[in-house]
Amino acid sequence: MAFENLKISRHISSSTKNLLKAKKIMAALASNPQMLTRQAHGNKKEQLWRKESLNLEKKCGFCVSVYSNEKLGRSHMEKEWRLKAFWSNIAQPTTLEMEPINNVEELDAVLSHARQLSQPIIIEWMASWCRKCIYLKPKLEKLAAEYNNRAKFYYVDVNKVPQTLVKRGNISKMPTIQLWKEDEMKEEVIGGHKGWLVIEEVRELINKFV
């Protein structure tokens, strides 16, 4: 019986403490009604930020993260938008325009820069009257985007450059796609067959040297 009375006494004591805490909180809110206003305002702003995040994600295809941070007990909300590409083709280009090489000096400069980066370069030797050359150029520019920062792509129009440059490449047929590395021509593909086969051969060529 004494044990049961003790349990009841403890329960009443605990309830009394909770009631006193509740009264203190109510008294604090009554004396400072701005606390409720700030909390409600903060919740409303949080909902607005999240709504705008969803709208932006639907429209732009971006992942949007909203971060809330309260420091040192202050009711201060810090918002930070962080946009990340949802599709890989947003982050990387789908095509890279090939740059022309106009003379031997430019070729030497290109090779020197590639040597410093320890990267190969691809050169399409072409002519404006060569239909196959014109057909391959945009496909090679797509391949250039695929190997961006690993290999650099160039072209030489043999009708617009000195013959010393053409002889440097030892060109006899067009289109000819060559891979150069460490100041030397390593391998080449003669593009007389189907375009997709040429591109695959060039890709295999690059993979051997990157």
Swiss-Prot record:
The active site is at C130 (nucleophile), C133 (nucleophile). Belongs to the thioredoxin family. Residues 81-210 form the Thioredoxin domain. Keywords: Chloroplast, Disulfide bond, Electron transport, Plastid, Redox-active center, Transit peptide, Transport. Its main location: plastid. Probable thiol-disulfide oxidoreductase that may participate in various redox reactions. InterPro entries: Thioredoxin-like_sf, Thioredoxin_domain, WCRKC1/2. CDD domains: TRX_family. PROSITE patterns: THIOREDOXIN_2. One of its GO terms (cellular component) is chloroplast stroma. Disulfide bonds join C130-C133. The gene is WCRKC1. This is Thioredoxin-like 3-1, chloroplastic. It comes from Arabidopsis thaliana (Mouse-ear cress). It is found in: Plastid, Chloroplast stroma.
